[in-house]
Amino acid sequence: MERLKAALQDCDVVVIGAGAGLSTAAGFVYTGERFENYFSDFAKKYGIKDMYSGGFYPFATPEEHWAYWSRYIYINRYMDAPKPVYDDLLKLVNGKDYFVITTNVDHCFQKAGFDKKRLFYTQGDYGLFQCSEPCCQETFDNEAVIREMVKWQENMKVPTELLPTCPHCGKPLTMNLRSDNKFVEDKGWHRAAERYENFLRTREGQKILFLELGVGYNTPVIIKYPFWQMTAKNPNAIYACINQGQAVCPQEIQQRSICMNADVGYIVSLAV
């Protein structure tokens, strides 16, 4: 803990890499009581066991599909995080030169007040639709229609007139989430990717803390492996990994690494 505090104090730059474990620590849990509270009807009718697997359920109609998804998006994107982990994290980097790269799609960084120009969320956003085709590299804000779907759904179906369609080609809209090669990387996505690359390039060789939070091995090529490589390349860099159950680093950077097998929220609250 002391080493982490010292690293935060001494560094000129903080690059945060955030995975699903960070949002879990903030209370966005997809199982158990939270699932029961919001999806007991779906669990009963369809045998769905948790929110995540429900997202893959082959519903017979689009009205049922969107009844499930609108509720899912509403509670995981438009409701506030149950615990203040993201707020604590913002306090931690306040006044620092920082950038955030995240595979999370729940918008928690923006909601906590992180600078949007210092954020790159690589895998999409629960708050955006895209064309299912896709006929265009464009995304569409979904808040208004999601709130309507949640409000007007009955018997686990949304009214047909609320089904979202592409304004350009009329095909159904779908979530802007990376699951296959149809994922739309819109102008905003490319601008964020460019800002992240620029940030790293212009801070090469500086005292950088690569702070990895709640990142597992689902997509290690996005955050984990690059953080290891950049730490190995820069003798002034420190790699810190906080993750329940999986906090490791390669031997080459062991001397300049802080690996904490612990609850991310707890450690962040201690570090503030």
Task: List the predicted regions and their residue ranges.
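Conserved catalytic alpha/beta core of Sir2/sirtuin-type deacylases, generalized to analogous enzyme cores
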Residues: 1-272
